[in-house]
Amino acid sequence: IQLPGDENSLLPVHSDTWAGDSPFEVVAWVPLVNVFSTNAMFILPKKKYKKISFNKIPFKTNDDLYKKISKHLKFIKIQYGEILIFNQNLPHGNIVNKTNITRWSFNCRFKSLFSPYNQKKFLEFFVPLNIKPATLDGIDYEEPNFK
């Protein structure tokens, strides 16, 4: 929930992978109202992301980074009923909502059971929604101990 003028619900520019999420997941961002301008989130487009070497940008805080890349950030415009599926490796966040509309939104993360994890491991952070029978067979498989 992001109320107009509320400075307590801010997420400064970040990438979820910087906080331990797997680079092999995607996020479905679901706003429950029309979002635009400052009541939406911003994201660094993939084309710009690929041109920036974050290891070469001198910054100590999220605010420093925001100042360096702010001219490239794009605010998302989505109508109620639409969702954004995005690469959470891309820097994103929000700023103070300067509109008169409260933003209600939630997000869900999706990744394959078999894609690499980062700091947030299987069943520590993720719960499988659907495991196929072939996957269950593979999980249950025990290698015979031939002698």
Language model: regions and residue ranges:
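Catalytic core of non-heme Fe(II) oxygenases with the double-stranded beta-helix
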Residues: N8-I76, Q119
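Conserved double-stranded beta-helix
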Residues: Y49-K147
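Long, hydrophobic, well-ordered secondary-structure blocks that form the structural core
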Residues: I1-N8
